[in-house]
Amino acid sequence: EISVRDWSSDVCSSDLEFLTARLHAILMERGIPADLVDAVLSVDVERVAEAGSRAEALAAFRRESDFTELAVAFRRVVNILPKGFSKVVDPSRFVTSAERALHAEAATLRAETEHLVRARDYFQALQRIAAIRPIVDMFFEEVMVMVDDRDLQENRLAILKEVADLFSGIADFSKIAVAP
């Protein structure tokens, strides 16, 4: 397995940029769409050998019926999150059942998908993550995130951050083109 983490600090960022560009070209030659390649290479490019597997799994998952809905739900989640947001969820501040449900499902999926990502079963991880979409939809239908109560607002944003983090081991879904 090739990992940039194993290289000495003498390796220039230009070398990493060259390798990333080369990997981009290789994945494109394999027929993987540019937006999916960009999404995969935006996440943990240090693990070069895994980037191809993640891109292929993402391309296969794109052909699934619930891909577009999942990509739209992810965008909805990340669009509301402030840059660099890093608060932690406080379950004692939950007001609605939708908050509890989304937090619980995110925790369950995190445990399941971390195992699948470590096993490099990216397609199965994506299928499992897709299970959260109806709960995300329910959350947005029932919960006002940007409320005046700052603590409540931050807690709700923290729940959404947990959802966004589910994707972080595979791809940056915000880079994926989705038909309207």
Where are these regions (language model features)?
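Amphipathic alpha-helical "coupling" segments that flank catalytic cores
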Residues: 9-180
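Positively charged, low-complexity/disordered segments
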Residues: 1-11
